[in-house]
């Protein structure tokens, strides 16, 4: 969430404009989505968010069961949460570029559906859960490759694939900057379900060493399989339509990071060193809505003008002032999370 928060200010792009060199260009590129084929750091954020949501679901469900909740009661809570995720996901992008925008492909709307997929198998054995994730990957592959609609019969070409046809049929606004397909939630369901499985593993009675090995092994296997699919041109790695190779690689990366974090934080007990990050994570939904609703639409631009113009009086270049404004916005947003943390105010769906 901290990376997402700093990235949403446009900090790395503004640093590149202020200090153009190969290093800042690399950072700027990594904090932008790939144009079509390939993978950047920024592309991994959404899959990581969805995977961690599955892990959090495992913890929440365990606490509910310990408190005497039935499956039906837990399901109703999940259903309510999915409704609010869907509502907020539509609301935050309902007005864009000066007109109404019907959007069903951002992280909140996608998570609304993947949450239901993961919860549907929460009481099933591991082999069944894993089989469902494989189906999540195979179903889009079959749909994209086997359905041939004139103008939408090229499975891995932007705007000419089956997912684009569904977008058009539903009246979803798509352009060169916003070309994510609604049906991505099918393959992304694997992310949230893998997160659920990882969470159940972490809360099991297996040894910490075995948990660490399982997470790393699964991560390496997923990355290897995804890269093989991409490098052999069987299925290219495409973030925008969430191909199976993309889901496997990003899911694998997230599981490895989760395993390393578990080993370093929980097993080796370094929890106190991460307070800066956990303060943001404890209000992740709130701060996400804040920097989309307020940051993107007003605060970022306002602070850029204010800082760059004022600092220019001290002979600081406008581009450098714009980069500094991003740091100020980031610190303001972090302090807002800190204030909520100190007041014990946590926004949950």
What are these regions (language model features)?
Residues 1-349:
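Alpha-helical transmembrane segments and their immediate juxtamembrane cytosolic regions
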């Amino acid at each position: 969430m901290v990376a997402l928060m700093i990235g949403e200010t446009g900090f790395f792009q503004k640093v590149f404009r202020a200090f153009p060199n190969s290093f800042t260009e690399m950072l700027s590129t990594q904090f932008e989505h790939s144009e079509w084929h390939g993978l950047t750091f920024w592309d991994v954020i959404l899959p990581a968010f969805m995977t961690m949501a599955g892990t959090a679901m495992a913890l929440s469900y365990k606490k509910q069961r310990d408190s005497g909740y039935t499956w039906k009661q837990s399901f109703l809570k999940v259903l309510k949460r999915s409704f609010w995720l869907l509502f907020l996901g539509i609301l935050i992008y309902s007005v864009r570029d000066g007109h109404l925008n019907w959007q069903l492909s951002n992280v909140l709307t996608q998570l609304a559906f993947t949450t239901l997929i993961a919860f549907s198998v929460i009481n099933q054995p591991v082999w069944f859960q894993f089989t469902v994730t494989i189906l999540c990957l195979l179903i889009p592959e079959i749909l994209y490759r086997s359905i041939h609609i004139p103008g939408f019969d090229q499975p891995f070409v932007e705007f000419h694939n089956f997912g684009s046809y569904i977008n058009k049929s539903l009246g979803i606004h798509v352009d060169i900057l916003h070309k994510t397909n609604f049906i991505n939630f099918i393959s992304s369901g694997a992310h949230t379900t893998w997160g659920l499985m990882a969470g159940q593993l972490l809360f099991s009675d297996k040894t910490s060493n075995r948990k660490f090995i399982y997470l790393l092994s699964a991560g390496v296997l997923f990355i290897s399989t995804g890269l093989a699919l991409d490098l052999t041109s069987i299925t290219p790695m495409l973030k925008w339509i969430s191909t199976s190779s993309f889901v496997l690689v990003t899911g694998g990366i997230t599981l490895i990071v989760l395993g390393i974090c578990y080993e370093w934080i929980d097993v080796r007990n370094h929890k106190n060193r991460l307070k800066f990050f956990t303060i943001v994570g404890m209000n992740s939904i709130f701060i996400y809505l804040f920097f989309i609703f307020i940051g993107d639409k007003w605060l970022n631009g306002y602070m850029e003008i204010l800082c760059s113009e004022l600092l220019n009086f001290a002979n600081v270049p406008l581009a450098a002032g714009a980069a500094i404004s991003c740091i100020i916005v980031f610190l303001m947003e972090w302090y807002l999370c800190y204030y909520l943390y100190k007041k014990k105010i946590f926004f949950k769906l």
